[in-house]
Amino acid sequence: MTRRDTTRVIRPATGPERTCKSWLTEAALRMLMNNLHPDVAERPEELVVYGGIGRAARDWESYDKIVETLRRLEDDETLLVQSGKPVGVFRTHADAPRVLIANSNLVPRWASWEHFNELDRKGLAMYGQMTAGSWIYIGAQGIVQGTYETFVEMGRQHYGGDLSGRWLLTAGLGGMGGAQPLAAVMAGAACLAIECQPSSIEMRLRTGYLDRSTDKVEEALAWIEESCAAKTPISVGLLGNAAELLPELFKRGVRPDLLTDQTSAHDPVNGYLPAGWSLERWHAMRDQDPPQVAEAAKASMAAHVKAMLDFQAAGVPTVDYGNNIRQMALEEGVTNAFDFPGFVPAYIRPLFCRGVGPFRWAALSGDPEDIAKTDAKVKELIPDNPHLHNWLDMAGQKIRFQGLPARICWVGLGDRHRLGLAFNEMVAKGELKAPIVIGRDHLDSGSVASPNRETEAMRDGSDAVSDWPLLNALLNTASGATWVSLHHGGGVGMGFSQHAGMVIVCDGTEAAAKRVARVLWNDPATGVMRHADAGYDIALACAREKGLDLPGIL
């Protein structure tokens, strides 16, 4: 089992020529490779895409076998992938998914990091995060609009909708957290982001998500102060450890206008540097003594959360951004760790009630012009949404593509299928140079059960009910998605979430149009269904408006 290979540089093919037998399998191959593009993946030599140890394949041998199998897969066959390893090819039919993926799923009683890490060391499992192991990660852009929407809503609730002259304090500049600086600036706020790994800061600078960086606290604060005074937002990366710096900043009397965190606290062994430790010690001890690392990391998380609670008590709007750091602190004795809310119940749930979530697409041509054309098509089909148009304009100006050109765009039930059908027609007419892949984050309205994040504080108390993502995956499979994934532990770590993903390919054919119409209606409709079942009035109204048949609910 080879987990590290520094000799490989993976980039997807581009253009109209295929190496697979159909565009459906070619799309899966290109998106798998795109996840490992050096401008996309955090540690591509280790197959790690983002989120601590979120991988695209279990090991390099498995990666090679997946590539080989996709290239020979027939139009009526389906590849099964078990925790990043290809395990079977079976005859199905043309409208069935070409790939079905299950990553890091464990029987609940055994669903702990300790048991998973034991399996991982034996080569029996792989952590897929959300979009790492499901081959639809598009770099930091994949989370940037959701982060932007959250910051805009924070500004609306706390500052009358105006974040100019204000600033956000946060930590974590990995594959997810790396979206924060750009999202804050796009929302009108300056951002100071603490990050312990120089490589993560360098990647955000290189890809345009961060404006400048320093390892000096005074310099960072001076830049933020100047930015706020001029009402010209900038983003600053500060090299350091959040567990050390947040308490220090509070003691100094520093008071940001907004506070959150996106360190990889979900994984106490691989994701969070203990206070007082060097990177070298951390990397060595992760292999030598994982329990000691976890113990030290969780103690540091407790200090981190205590500082966040101090800021909140001082009047700073504070929110958990879904990395499970509150749970880790609670287990370390911080009994009031959940006094600050998660971002979904605080700011995002009304969108989920209408099936609105992180719709994304990528241009298999590799040509940015194809994304520009699809952006224009979105505006044409949804003409009466100035907020969405503003987002697309900003994205076109400020977001640099990582790997294959792609776009994230939060839309919901009734719009997703219209956009998909329009993209498919553009491919059919030759307006786009190659097919389009449409997917989404597993963080969506009907595809996840995560009591400390997406399903926190559900109205009916159904936070931990995970039937919903299972039903979502089953329905997407029956509807004809090109590949479907079912994962455990993404975002918040082992034992705390189950979630499903889907991808559909627009190859310009009539058969694709039928699949697109089914999948991109049914997928967001499950989100409306899930929230209607929980008793949310917005979801119930949406279900009635869209004519959903929900016999046990309506």
Swiss-Prot record:
This is Urocanate hydratase. Pfam families: Urocanase (PF01175), Urocanase_C (PF17392), Urocanase_N (PF17391). GO terms for biological process: L-histidine catabolic process to glutamate and formamide; L-histidine catabolic process to glutamate and formate. It comes from the Bacteria. Keywords: Cytoplasm, Histidine metabolism, Lyase, NAD. One of its GO terms (cellular component) is cytoplasm. It comes from Caulobacter vibrioides (strain NA1000 / CB15N) (Caulobacter crescentus). Catalyzes the conversion of urocanate to 4-imidazolone-5-propionate. Its EC number is 4.2.1.49. It is found in: Cytoplasm.
